[in-house]
Amino acid sequence: MTSLGLYIHIPFCRSRCDYCGFYSIGRKPTDRYIDALIKEMDLKSPDFEDRLCDTVYLGGGTPSSLSEAQLTRLMKALSQHFRISDAAEITMEMNPCDMSESYLKNAMRAGVNRISIGVQEKHDHLLSAIGRRHTAKEAETAVKRAYRMGFHNLSLDLMYELPGQTVKDFEASLRWAVHLPVNHMSIYSLILEDGTRMAQLAERGRLARPSEEESWAMYQAMCRILPAYGFERYEISSFARKGYRSRHNQKYWELSDYLGLGPAACSRIGRTRTENTPGVRLYEKELLTGHPPQQEVETLSDIDEMEEYCFLHLRMKEGLPLDGFRKRYGEDITHWYGDAVKMLKEKKLLKEDAGHLFLTYHGAALGNFVFEQFLQD
């Protein structure tokens, strides 16, 4: 039987970042919410009793907004309901402000062995501009403290194309980050999500963002600096030193099975994709009165899955295996995407080598355009 990934959504934040489009609410987690999560485990875990969970990911929101007691209780419940591998990668997203020595000790005792830290930038004026609560010094102290206490699988999130950010700012952030004791970085360009404060400012013409030339220079800096310090780009937004790829995120890109718990959490089992409806109060009410959470359910068609197979594999360093596509869908990729592949090769956005299709250097920079070519009308 294939392995299973677990995702647990902790949709609480002390304050909402100006760019964030994820479902979250501005208050501390309650014990009632942990009660509801455990009820969801009660309902769903029997269907997975023969599956070995080799990755667990606590995402948000801000999972480190959980109290030490709440985190301990949650992790204990997971181990009681699911078969967690002794070698499982257990990741928890943390805000630098929450990473006290006491909190880190408790997280380690609870089973967390990988921390993803939302750093975003090294310049305090830019952190303030995007609504982050921590300073660069607090982030650096938190990272070094976690490493000193035995967390050697640490990941940083960084962002570029921020309002007011210069190429020199981003280069300085990269050079600062590579000298921290981390082995993984996720680097994202700013996307203006509908309904966020930043999107509203942009609509009013009050958001000064880097030019296209500056954005391209930032992209080039990322691709130049990180490999020079041993960080391999193994996915379009992800860089890791050898042996430190995110095993949980690879499940998403490889179309593997994962189960999501919590409001707005997504699951994918085979070709069935489900999403719990957002709303903490509704989620708690349903589960604490003995009902499953309301869900949206979608069964992927052959075409839907084929599209995902193409653009998710193209995100990764290993690329899209042409023989794997043929075996999975019964036809060469040219049967479905011949014109698109030809056009993308001519534009030097795709290349073919050793039976795989890969994004080129420029193709990775224009990833969304490339991926759109694999969507059927």
Where are the language model's segments positioned?
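Flexible, acidic/Gly-rich N-terminal and inter-domain linker regions that tether
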Residues: M1-L4, S15
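Conserved N-terminal Rossmann-fold NAD(P)-binding element of oxidoreductases
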Residues: I8
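A short, conserved structural fragment
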Residues: K345-G355
